[in-house]
Amino acid sequence: MTAPPVHDRAHHPVRDVIVIGSGPAGYTAALYAARAQLAPLVFEGTSFGGALMTTTDVENYPGFRNGITGPELMDEMREQALRFGADLRMEDVESVSLHGPLKSVVTADGQTHRARAVILAMGAAARYLQVPGEQELLGRGVSSCATCDGFFFRDQDIAVIGGGDSAMEEATFLTRFARSVTLVHRRDEFRASKIMLDRARNNDKIRFLTNHTVVAVDGDTTVTGLRVRDTNTGAETTLPVTGVFVAIGHEPRSGLVREAIDVDPDGYVLVQGRTTSTSLPGVFAAGDLVDRTYRQAVTAAGSGCAAAIDAERWLAEHAATGEADSTDALIGAQR
């Protein structure tokens, strides 16, 4: 049983749980917290729904045997969380203070909201090349997830951009579907581990194009080609591909909390053991903000469920001692 509600100076109720972020992790955390009668306040952000909002077809999410579009899946998750009483707001979070029994969250309109527990589910963003045509054709031939979209390029010629383990793994995986894969890298040396590089080099379907940078992605409604430039000669050529997979890494959206909680050298939030607990009591993290390995909708949803359960248990344990109900320990929001 959680502590009774109190109100802050601006008459906002102090919540049991605030969820920051949407997508599969955030919405699932909201659903489970709502069903546990925690009345979660969820800040989805103005760009809600996460990376799946740019995914045209999702065929590997359990329960949808005929597939579903990314936006449709997010809408279903969102509506399900609403059905059970989650308070969803399309507002961006400006700053947070996560120390002490009461956590504070400041939104872009300057309003301060407080809660006894916070679930972080801001996700991670794929790094992109920022060249003409790339963002315009995202989800229409340009992708950052071979596992998600590789199937749609069966018997087609595609390109993978990158030189690390992720690029080698994506290229190798895509040979299951594609007729050919051209791996484009700006140098002739690779950051990839030897075993991953050798695996790609020994695959007859993979062609290496080194010392080339991407100039633009061609196409009006779908990808029709990839323009590249030779870094030695400056000559430009166009690769006749219908798919472009960008594999130059991901950036966890942890900037909001990076100075407050423990993160790894790349900015992924660290959790304790098999839980979703972070280095701060009452603060939990889920989804791609934590997961640098799988980055799938179903795994993100699972960790969102775990975060809500962890938060519920933590609140129940601390309500008995009154630790989760102190209004004197609020540390002002850091701007």
Curated annotation (Swiss-Prot):
Cell compartments where the protein resides: Cytoplasm
What enzyme category does the UniProt record give?
A: oxidoreductase
PTM N-acetylthreonine: list the residues: 2
Q: Any S-S bridges, and between which cysteines? A: 145-148
GO cellular component: a single term: cytosol
Return one Gene Ontology term, BP aspect. Answer: removal of superoxide radicals
Alphabetized Pfam families for the sequence: Pyr_redox_2
What are the names of the required cofactors? FAD
Residues annotated as binding NADP(+): 166, 185, 191, 248, 268, 295
Q: Where does FAD bind?
A: 22-25, 44-51, 60, 93, 288, 295-298
Where in the sequence is the signal peptide annotated? none
Self-association or partners: how does it assemble? Answer: Homodimer.
Protein function? Essential thiol-reducing enzyme that protects the cell from thiol-specific oxidizing stress. Plays a minor role in defense against oxidative and nitrosative stress. Is essential to establish and maintain infection in mice.
Q: What does the sequence similarity comment in the record state about its family? A: Belongs to the class-II pyridine nucleotide-disulfide oxidoreductase family.
Name this protein carries in UniProt: Thioredoxin reductase
